[in-house]
């Protein structure tokens, strides 16, 4: 550990300033010793504060307002974001740790890259003094005095610049940006259309004054072709209903009565094609045919699990009906 520096070596000729000691856990004993010595020698008009550098870098706390003097009791190299967080025109004292002469060159280069100015002479061989760069001032634009305006001289503002009009870009580039057809597709994208895209949509007129629009029906002696369109639409609807009934009729765990459903031999649970159109639901609840258990109070199979038509039902004494 280097020899301790007397606190009077860090006195500021410009007046009292807040002294902040930034330390780390790697150099905790040196940090505590310097903080104690500065507090014992500080005049009543100045204050000495201590803070861990990680709290400053993590924005857990902020630096005191200027005027400010910062003591860095940190291992080398210094954290990359520390130098940029130091306020302008702030004097810093870097307390060099022992056996770190090989890293002094990189330290001076880092300080010079951030425009820190060295302060000579240094308080001690183990302490470096630097001053952070001052805040940049706003540039002032000097303007020549303009003559008094007259009736023949146009009035212009001092320091005004001529208005720069934006020139039109390449017209071919703009046209390609908004083009509908792509040169990458030879047919202009027509091959990407599906049969559903090519189908002409139905013309449905919206309701007026809240009254629904009635659909025009074909006459008995229709000759305009509307009757054929209605028949084709009804055929498509009927085919869709029959297709939807297939999935229902092919279920083998329903309980439709036997007089409405007769399975073919060897294909139990499969309805014959001629019986599918004749089958209708007769249940009041509509759940028994969907494979649900018998739950209606008037059902003779109340409490039994669903079974297939034609299956022999055996109820044991232990069953709770």
UniProtKB/Swiss-Prot annotation:
Name of the protein in its database record: Fe-S cluster assembly protein DRE2
Disulfide bonds: none
The keyword Transit peptide appears for this protein: no
Assembly notes: Monomer. Interacts with TAH18. Interacts with MIA40.
Region (Fe-S binding site B), start-end ranges: 285-299
Family per record: Belongs to the anamorsin family.
Residue ranges with Low complexity bias: 139-156
Description of its domains: The C-terminal domain binds 2 Fe-S clusters but is otherwise mostly in an intrinsically disordered conformation.
Keyword tRNA processing: no
Lineage of origin: Eukaryota, Fungi, Dikarya, Basidiomycota, Agaricomycotina
Binding residues annotated for [2Fe-2S] cluster, in chain numbering: 203, 219, 222, 224
Ranges where the record places region Linker: 162-197
Domain of life per record: Eukaryota
Region (Disordered): 123-168
Assigned keywords, A-Z: 2Fe-2S, 4Fe-4S, Cytoplasm, Iron, Iron-sulfur, Metal-binding, Mitochondrion
Region feature (Fe-S binding site A): 203-224
Gene of this entry: DRE2
GO MF, one example: 4 iron, 4 sulfur cluster binding
Motif (Cx2C motif 1): 285-288
The protein's required cofactors: [2Fe-2S] cluster; [4Fe-4S] cluster
Localization terms from the record: Cytoplasm; Mitochondrion intermembrane space
One CC-aspect GO term: mitochondrial intermembrane space
């Amino acid at each position: 550990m280097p020899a301790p520096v007397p606190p009077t070596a860090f006195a500021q000729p410009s007046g009292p300033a807040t002294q902040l000691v930034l330390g780390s856990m790697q150099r905790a004993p040196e940090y505590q010793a310097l903080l104690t010595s500065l507090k014992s020698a500080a005049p009543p008009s100045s204050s000495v504060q201590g803070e861990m550098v990680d709290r400053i870098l993590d924005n857990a706390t902020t630096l005191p307002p200027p005027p400010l003097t910062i003591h860095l009791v940190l291992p080398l190299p210094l954290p990359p974001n520390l130098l940029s967080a130091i306020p302008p025109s702030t004097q810093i004292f870097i307390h060099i740790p022992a056996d770190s002469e090989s890293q002094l060159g990189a330290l001076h280069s880092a300080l010079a890259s951030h425009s820190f100015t060295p302060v000579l002479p240094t308080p001690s061989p183990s302490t470096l003094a630097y001053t952070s760069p001052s805040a940049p001032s706003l540039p002032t634009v000097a303007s020549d005095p303009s003559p008094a305006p007259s009736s023949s001289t146009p009035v212009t503002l001092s320091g005004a610049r001529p208005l720069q009009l934006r020139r039109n870009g390449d017209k071919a580039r703009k046209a390609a940006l908004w083009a509908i057809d792509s040169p990458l597709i030879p047919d202009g994208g027509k091959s990407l259309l599906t049969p559903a895209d090519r189908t002409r949509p139905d013309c449905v007129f919206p309701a007026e004054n809240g009254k629904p629009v009635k659909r025009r029906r074909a006459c008995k002696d229709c000759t305009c072709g509307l009757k054929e369109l209605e028949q084709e639409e009804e055929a498509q609807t009927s085919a869709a209903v029959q297709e939807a009934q297939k999935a229902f009729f092919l279920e083998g765990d329903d309980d439709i009565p036997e007089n409405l459903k007769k399975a073919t031999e060897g294909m139990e649970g499969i309805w014959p094609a001629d019986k599918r159109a004749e089958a209708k639901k007769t249940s009041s609840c509509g759940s028994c045919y969907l494979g649900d258990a018998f739950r209606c109070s008037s059902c003779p199979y109340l409490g039994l699990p669903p079974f297939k038509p034609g299956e022999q039902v055996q109820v044991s004494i232990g069953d709770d009906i």
